[in-house]
């Protein structure tokens, strides 16, 4: 039996973790033995229980000895190292335990802000190391491949494998809105790279003019103190939400304010629900929305507000949204992603 070892920082509710969760299920259904090693996470992480249904999960900070045991027992396994921390640990443990696993890098980052000098400097190290180790590399986005090639990453064996629709969504029985009244939707944890400052500024311009609308925020890390006083009555903070389809389905629009991204899953999720999207270009958002008729990328906050106001003043007909959703559901089928991973890892 083929064995695949995943090494990832945590199993929290992020884009990479969502893709991992779905891949673990698909590989398990195709008789691939797997072990997931969570470097910093714990059993309460958002995706831990779901992943544990299909394979063994090792929490490093609970029992590091199990990591050694796995590396020694599965010397011929392939290691899929997720993100930079996973990459570092994979090579560190392979050297420490003197084993021969084949390591594949899974790079999720596609852009960096000007102030991220340390991160950019680190890329030079990773680029040099990738050439020395001649590691195979999977990029989650075309933008990620482009950026890393600038830093001299090994090109011998690499591929861009986009996430598509990684999360299993229940697209039926969404007739009842989970939110009272009309709303604009933002989905994402509180993180400076995801543009919370942009979101608040846009909301301050838009919501006072539209008192019947609210801003609904779903994602971890948001607190009431982060919302300006004049917006508190028109803002709803939900935290992490498991059943997100009703939120997408009944939203007037999804707003996407990120500065940097890899492959933003929220855009795909919104598309398969037929939700209009207004956003800035980040990561692979242009390629994701290229064939989605209800997606609008803008260059300024002024244009952002104008697009949202148009959707508020002239809401799209349900039939238009349903047609766009059906097309997107076919276009973003995760089976294509799984097959690409399988063929790359087990050629």
Language-model regions: role of each:
Residues 240, 259:
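Aromatic "clamp/platform" in nucleotide-sugar-dependent glycosyltransferases that forms part
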Residues 291-303, 310-315:
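Conserved acidic donor-binding segment of nucleotide-sugar-dependent glycosyltransferases
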Residues 133-158, 165:
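A short, active-site helix/loop in glycosyltransferases that binds the activated sugar's phosphate group
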Residues 149, 157-181:
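Acidic anion/phosphate-binding donor-loop and adjacent secondary structure
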Residues 81-87, 107:
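Short His-centered aromatic/hydrophobic patch
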Residues 14-25, 182, 186-205, 217, ...:
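A conserved mid-protein helix/loop that constitutes part of the nucleotide-sugar donor-binding site
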Residues 276-279:
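Short hydrophobic beta-strand element within catalytic cores of glycosyltransferases
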Residues 6-62, 221-223:
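N-terminal strand-loop element at the rim of the active site
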């Amino acid at each position: 039996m083929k064995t695949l070892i995943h090494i990832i920082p945590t199993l929290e509710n992020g884009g990479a973790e969502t893709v991992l969760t779905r891949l673990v299920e698909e590989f398990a259904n195709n008789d691939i033995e797997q072990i997931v090693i969570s470097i910093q996470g714990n059993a309460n992480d958002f995706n831990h229980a779901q992943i544990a249904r299909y394979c063994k999960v090792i929490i490093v900070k609970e029992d590091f000895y199990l990591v050694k045991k796995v590396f020694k027992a599965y010397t011929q396994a392939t290691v899929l190292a997720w993100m930079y921390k996973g990459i570092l640990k994979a090579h560190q443990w392979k050297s420490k335990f003197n084993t021969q696993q084949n390591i594949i890098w899974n790079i999720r980052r596609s852009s960096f802000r000007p102030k991220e000098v340390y991160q950019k400097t680190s890329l030079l190290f990773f680029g040099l190391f990738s050439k020395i180790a001649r590691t195979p590399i999977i990029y989650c986005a075309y933008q990620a491949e482009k950026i890393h090639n600038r830093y001299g990453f090994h090109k011998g064996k690499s591929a861009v494998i986009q996430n598509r629709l990684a999360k299993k969504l229940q697209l039926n029985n969404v007739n009842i809105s989970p939110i009272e009244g009309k709303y604009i939707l933002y989905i994402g944890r509180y993180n400076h790279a995801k543009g919370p400052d942009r979101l608040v500024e846009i909301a301050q311009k838009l919501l006072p003019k539209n008192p019947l609308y609210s801003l609904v925020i779903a994602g971890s890390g948001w607190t009431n103190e982060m919302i300006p006083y004049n917006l508190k009555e028109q803002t709803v903070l939900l935290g992490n939400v498991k059943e997100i389809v009703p939120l997408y389905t009944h939203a007037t629009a999804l707003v996407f304010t990120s500065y940097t991204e890899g492959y933003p899953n929220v855009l795909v999720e919104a598309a398969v629900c037929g939700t209009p999207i207004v956003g800035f270009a980040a990561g692979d958002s242009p390629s994701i929305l290229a064939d989605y008729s209800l997606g609008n990328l803008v260059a300024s906050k002024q244009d952002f507000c104008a697009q949202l106001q148009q959707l508020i003043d002239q809401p799209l007909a349900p039939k238009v949204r349903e047609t766009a959703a059906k097309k997107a559901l076919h276009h973003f089928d995760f089976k294509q992603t799984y097959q690409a991973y399988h063929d790359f890892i087990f050629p």
